Amino acid sequence: MRPLYEACRRMLKTRARRIPLIDMDDETGRETVVCVITQYRILKFIAVNNEHNTVLLKKPVRDIGLGTYSNLATARMTDTVLSAVHMMVKHNISCIPIVDKHGHVLNVFEAVDIIPCIKGGVYDDLDKTIGDALCKRPDDSPGIYSCSPDDRLDSIFETLRKSRVHRLIVVDDESKLIGIISLSDIIRYVLFAGEEEDGNSLD
């Protein structure tokens, strides 16, 4: 578990979403990349192997302060893809919740949604609306994963066990945007909570 623990620490300190695992090649004596480990794979491993750990997981999201709830960047379906790109760069984010005029969450626009708009080196589609860009998603696109502030962390891990989740959108009973929980938020909480029990610190 120590290497996995160190991988989590390095991800948090560098804000990396994935890091390569290096091993020494016996034949060449050189370091070689064995695989690339992602935040999702780490959390999936924890979710599968700590199913019965109830001490830290049976706490509501609101009680542990998990996620971001202020200065949230949002967009409308009628906004252009280019405006979303500028917003992502400005706020250093990879996802923007799409809301209606009442603040109800309709969808999310992700960095990967930009790729079809610049395919072939043609950038005209960047002037199209976010709604148009989302229509280019494959039919099996997973859509939004959401939770409420009262959902417990173990229910989030249950979702991670079953689905490939990159983030959760926190909404109220009317599906209005409250916050966003990223995978790094969850990893940070798991590390801090575990280190507090051991009397250690991340810094």
Where are these regions (language model features)?
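Tandem CBS (Bateman) regulatory domains
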Residues: 39-73, 85-86, 110-161, 183-203
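Alpha-helical scaffold segments of alpha-solenoid architecture
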Residues: 94-118
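Proteins with a high burden of low-complexity, intrinsically disordered sequence enriched in S/T/G/P/A and R
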Residues: 1-3, 117
